[in-house]
């Protein structure tokens, strides 16, 4: 989408470019000129990209698991983590960081988060998930106290976690509690669901036949005991966009996005509460 000549944003871009050129001519105290490396053409390019991103973040249409989706704003924290930026999607800085990432990913470096770029990002997110979903031997699982679950009355046979994943989870909870000064009496990061047997997963799918594989997979990572659903706010496991908007804006979720990889946990991008223990993936 090209900006019109009368666009206020283009007028500001041109004014900024003039200021840049003027500053480059000013002497410093030691008599040298300022070294300004910003290309006015790049400034204009990223301004145009930022204008498109401001619309696409809510309007981009795409499909995931046979379900039509709209926009990528719910995934902003994950995108910012991938791009290594804190810039908001509608800014020039975000567009520039995106262009750099696009170049490294073999995509046209437009700075626009269009469908091609977004689906590439989805592929990256999905690549950091559990591949082998075999059920572990009983000795590899540990039974967790009911007090560590969101539902303290959860049946004993549904309170198992793979041992190494549980140890990493405890370290993660200790870190986030210290960093964010969380109240230990609240439900933040309590376990909603962990190990599920194939038989129990089939039972859940039978109870919710319209849930789809995005929510209740036939070959679930929960079979491994290394996938944990954790409480990050709102309704615990609702994929309603309004609920996910609440979840992705909590300080706990945003901390996880930035730091969970240090403890071996990586997200399922579509469900803010779902984290998988995959220590084999390096933190980027």
Question: Which residues are covered by each model-predicted region?
Answer:
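Short, solvent-exposed loop/turn and secondary-structure capping segments
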Residues: 110, 132-133, 203-207, 242-243
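A mature extracytoplasmic/lumenal domain signature
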Residues: 113, 117, 125, 193-195, ...
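Surface-exposed patches in mature extracellular/periplasmic domains of secreted proteins
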Residues: 108-113, 177-194, 215-219, 264-272
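Membrane-proximal structural modules of membrane-associated proteins and complexes
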Residues: 171-176, 192, 200, 221
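Charged, often glycine-rich, active-site loop that binds/positions anionic groups
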Residues: 198-213
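Catalytic cores and adjacent binding grooves of peptidoglycan-active enzymes
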Residues: 211-284
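Acidic helix/loop microenvironments that form the catalytic cleft of cell-wall polysaccharide enzymes
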Residues: 90-103, 199, 269-283
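Cell-envelope/ECM-targeting effectors and their regulatory/trafficking segments
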Residues: 2-183, 261
């Amino acid at each position: 989408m090209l900006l019109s000549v009368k666009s206020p944003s283009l007028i500001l871009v041109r004014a900024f470019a003039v200021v840049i050129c003027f500053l480059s001519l000013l002497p410093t105290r030691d008599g040298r000129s300022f070294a300004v490396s910003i290309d006015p053409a790049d400034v204009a390019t990223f301004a145009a990209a930022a204008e498109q991103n401001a619309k696409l973040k809510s309007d981009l249409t795409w499909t995931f698991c046979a379900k039509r989706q709209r926009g990528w704003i719910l995934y902003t924290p994950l995108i910012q983590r991938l791009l290594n930026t804190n810039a908001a999607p509608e800014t020039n800085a975000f567009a520039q960081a995106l262009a750099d990432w696009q170049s490294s990913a073999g995509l046209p470096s437009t700075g626009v988060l269009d469908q091609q770029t977004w689906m590439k990002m989805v592929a990256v997110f999905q690549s950091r998930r559990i591949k082998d979903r075999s059920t572990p031997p009983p000795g590899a699982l540990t039974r967790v106290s009911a007090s560590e679950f969101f539902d303290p009355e959860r049946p004993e046979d549904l309170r198992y976690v793979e041992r190494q994943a549980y140890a990493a989870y405890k370290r993660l909870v200790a870190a986030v509690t210290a960093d964010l000064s969380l109240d230990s009496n609240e439900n933040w990061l309590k376990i909603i669901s962990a190990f599920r047997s194939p038989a129990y997963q089939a039972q859940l799918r039978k109870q919710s036949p319209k849930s789809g594989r995005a929510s209740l997979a036939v070959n679930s990572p929960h079979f491994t005991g290394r996938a944990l659903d954790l409480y990050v706010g709102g309704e615990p496991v609702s994929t309603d966009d309004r609920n996910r908007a609440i979840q992705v804006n909590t300080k706990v979720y945003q901390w996880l996005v930035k730091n969970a990889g240090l403890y071996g946990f990586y997200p399922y991008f579509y469900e803010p509460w779902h984290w998988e223990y995959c220590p084999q993936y390096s933190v980027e």
